[in-house]
Curated annotation (Swiss-Prot):
HAMAP family: Ycf4. This is Photosystem I assembly protein Ycf4. The gene is ycf4. InterPro entries: PSI_Ycf4_assembly (IPR003359). Pfam families: Ycf4 (PF02392). Keywords: Membrane, Photosynthesis, Plastid, Thylakoid, Transmembrane, Transmembrane helix. Belongs to the Ycf4 family.
Amino acid sequence: MSWRSEHIWIELIAGSRKISNLCWAFILFLGSLGFFLVGTSSYLGRNLISFFPLQQIIFFPQGIVMSFYGIAGLFISSYLWCTISWNVGSGYDLFNRKEGIVCIFRWGFPGINRRIFLRFLLKDIRSVRIEVEEGIYAGRVLYMDIRGQRAIPLTRTDENLTPGEIEKKAAELAYFLRVPIEVF
């Protein structure tokens, strides 16, 4: 989503609160909880999951391995849920031609650097750059090339924009900022 006027362009960036992340976190939680309950059931000798026969799983070695995988999955699931609740990666890109500044803001993980805020002058922007990676995991990422600093990504690597969409976005941004486009 974006908002644009003659002198200001604000591009809102979606973070980790996506349907796919919610689905993966939910599936991983249920699967790892199931593994942990089966491993615990085999250790206790009681059936904690009614639709699964206990006699088929002995504690050593299957119960131990299932408990380990269940605990590992619960840790990964809790990491995903925390990332979703903190909305890591969300923020905005603000391009202000009137004041001659560019502000990039992103939410990070809790701590000292939770708020990531970058500010540049428009005159320091060398170009808008498109990087294309071909192969099985093909991707296109839009970067802003800043003098004296490394390139700053403006799109997510998992955004999967078509070549036409990334070209249109790069052309509009380059026209708005009055800088050239580079393709790598």
